[in-house]
Amino acid sequence: MSTVLSVTKRETGHRSTLTQLRKGGAIPAVIYGYKLDSTPISISAKEFKKSIQKNGQNSVFSLDLEGKKVNVVVSEVQQCSLKDEVNHVDFLAINMAEELEVDVPIKLIGQSVGVSEGGILMQPNLELKVKVKPAELPDSIEVDISSLKVGESLTVAEIRHQTPVEIISEDDYLLVTIVAPVSAEQEEVSASVEEEQV
């Protein structure tokens, strides 16, 4: 069952209006999508944060908009760069019977053999794009890295058929790689080369 969040329609106006909203403990937001025109709303910052911590950002929420329930997912969250606060939220209204294309976080599990041997784990991409019905939307996609050795990598092609949802990302989309550590000798050589170039 979706978590219900109460929201209120708001007037679009000056920056001072948005500042006043935030000072009052609310977050300016907008809802758009399935059978709904773009509608400016506000939501309790406390309730939004609590729901995200409990359910995860990739959950389906039910917004109570003036007595009307609207199923949504969080499309975008704008964070304040100086404080750990949410500045604005975009909600996407959805049809529960139709598949969505969304980005889902990658969750690495297991201890890599390569890391145990001194290798360095590199994760160039933190999310995967998937196609899934809202009710089946996962909080994350688990990727087992325990067998990875130094010099080895893992791409979408190697996990595509092990994942319960359809992955849209290309086969060569890199998930994780284990690189060899830089030795003290290599660092000295690199430093001396840089000095010669100077």
Swiss-Prot record:
A Pfam family reported for this protein in Swiss-Prot or TrEMBL: Ribosomal_L25p
Assembly mode: Part of the 50S ribosomal subunit; part of the 5S rRNA/L5/L18/L25 subcomplex. Contacts the 5S rRNA. Binds to the 5S rRNA independently of L5 and L18.
Gene Ontology CC annotation, any one: cytosolic large ribosomal subunit
Functional summary from the UniProt entry: This is one of the proteins that binds to the 5S RNA in the ribosome where it forms part of the central protuberance.
Name recorded for this polypeptide: Large ribosomal subunit protein bL25
GO terms assigned for molecular function: 5S rRNA binding; structural constituent of ribosome
Keywords assigned: Ribonucleoprotein, Ribosomal protein, RNA-binding, rRNA-binding
Example GO biological process: translation
Keyword Ribosomal protein on entry: yes
InterPro entries: Rbsml_bL25/Gln-tRNA_synth_N, Ribosomal_bL25/Gln-tRNA_synth, Ribosomal_bL25_b-dom, Ribosomal_bL25_C, Ribosomal_bL25_long, Ribosomal_L25_dom, Ribosomal_uL5_bac-type
Family indicated by similarity: Belongs to the bacterial ribosomal protein bL25 family. CTC subfamily.
